[in-house]
Amino acid sequence: YYVTSQVTNVLLLLDQYTPFKEALYNSFVKHLPINYKVDLLFHQYNERLFNTIIRESVGKYNKYIVMNFDNEKFSMVLNKIHPTKLLLLDFGKFEKEKYSYICQDFDEAFYQALLMLKEKLRHYPQLVLLFSKNLKHPQSSKEYFTRFCEEQGFLCEIQEDIENLTVRKGVVYIAIKQQDVVKVVKQGRLEGLKCGRDFGLLAYNDIPSYEVIDEGITSLSIDWEMMGNEAANFVLNNVPVQKFLPTEVRLRKSL
């Protein structure tokens, strides 16, 4: 009984599995003592599942670390959790002043990252953002992409049909999904084009394999390990945190 009473139960509710979410998770649990028990669940962007998980978890955990279902709208079911016990991760373009959060900015920070790459991008006259209809990424990123292209004089296109993608010379492709990065590289090879010379490729969210794929894929990303570390600090120290992590550019040979 004594040992059980010392266990701190934590719910870590993420949206879906990706290699960078795994980096977040590994960093999170690495910074917690052995008597902290973490239940890792995924809501898969299913609102009904998200609501069910939250409702059924109320009162069972000491801390709730949650990726909200939507970037634009706070999920009302989270009102069932006391604000001091809840930490919001990643999505956060909504009113959240009474809550702790560690989020990323999909708008202005995305725009500023493109500005940092402006001179590299100028080797290519056109930018194409790969944004399929079912992509669970904030729609507002499209507006900031278009704004950057218009202000900097790039031809721009937002391509929804990734299945029938044709890689063209003189184009930089911005890929959000890991599968789309692979698709662009493979399709470029089929067309006889070299990444980083004939066309460019920029990935959203860095993963270790981007260091070695096709001599290196340039990425823009928050530090997911830092997010995990800071989430662990929230759990351990009971200190409120409200911050947006910086979006960093990792320049490699694909641009």
Q: What spans do the regions from the language model cover?
A:
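Alpha-helical recognition/docking segments in bacterial nutrient-uptake
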Residues: 1-112, 172-173, 179
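Short, well-ordered beta-strand segments
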Residues: 10-13, 128, 202
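Short beta-strand elements in bilobed, periplasmic/extracellular small-molecule ligand-binding domains
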Residues: 32-44, 126-130, 142-167, 171-172
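Short, conserved loop/helix-junction motifs that constitute active-site signature segments
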Residues: 78-83, 121, 191-196
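Hydrophobic alpha-helical segments within soluble ligand-binding/sensing domains
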Residues: 92-128, 181, 220-240
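An alpha-beta-alpha
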Residues: 111-152, 243-255
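Flexible loop/turn connectors
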Residues: 167-172, 179-255
